[in-house]
């Protein structure tokens, strides 16, 4: 009987210790998706990039790439760059489950090109890393007016 009591007490102590152990938080899953706009040479075009998650987001940092012979980056929400690369960086504790970035380009040449995610990192509102699945934007550029193309500021 003493042996059974020791086993039961040992088992209960182990159960109590397990309750106090910290849990490893699993990463939040999110998607980084883009609009697929159509435009013409010389015109400005807006590509919308949107990060959506089941949990509230806090921080997104991304590097995007694009073909600088087809598109010229003009401006964007929390975005800087040019020459084929854009950096997006936003830290917003009140963002909720989505963050949206509007990126403005000028179309330079006919054809189809893309804006793609080269690298992306995210943190949810609990400080946990977000696993982000990335897509890309397909931008269709039709014939247009090359005289509208503005030279980049140097």
Where are each of the predicted segments found?
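Acidic, low-complexity intrinsically disordered segments
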Residues: 6-7, 11, 18, 23-154
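N-terminal secretory signal peptides that target proteins for export/translocation
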Residues: 1-4
